[in-house]
Amino acid sequence: MMKRELKKIRLKYELDDTIVIPQVDSKNIRLPGLEEFVIERGKALRVYRGMANRLADSGWVKIGEENLTLKDITSMRWLESSEEVLIKLPEFFYLKAVKLIGEGKDSKIMEVQNDLQEIIDIRLRKLIKLVFLKEAPANILERLQPEEKLLYSFLKEALKIWQKELMSPDGG
């Protein structure tokens, strides 16, 4: 179940709109599931992120959104470790961080991976504390990434069932 739900989050990320800036003069492009359209150099347009990545790989466009950098990840690690509560991370943070690792230079990949793992560990400890609250504050839950919301719901439900089973005279 968890794996399937994580795949849905990845799909949502790929189907999210993003802005691209064409780097070529007029070209007719036909993308799967869409009508043919014309791209013109410098004229921004919105496409699905998955398509934007393919167009960028071909050199036809540059993606308009800013990618995460090593500096971003390092500062988020520092902030996360210095705050008692979860910090607000950029939307789809984990998927963007993994993309950075995939595109990274060998010398920096290990540093990004270590910082990302530390962010995950710190946030997981904070998330587990939330699971034990009767009701977590809405403003804190809003700071969870989609993958973390999934884990929070799963753990909360598992704990609820476990407690119910323990307290039931017939085991459920």
Regions found by a protein language model. Give the residues of each.
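Generic hydrophobic secondary-structure signal
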Residues: V20, I39, L45-V47, L55, ...
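Short, functional N-terminal and low-complexity linear motifs
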Residues: V20-Q23, K62-E66, E80-V85
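Charge/polar-rich, low-complexity and marginally structured segments
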Residues: K3-R10, L68-G172
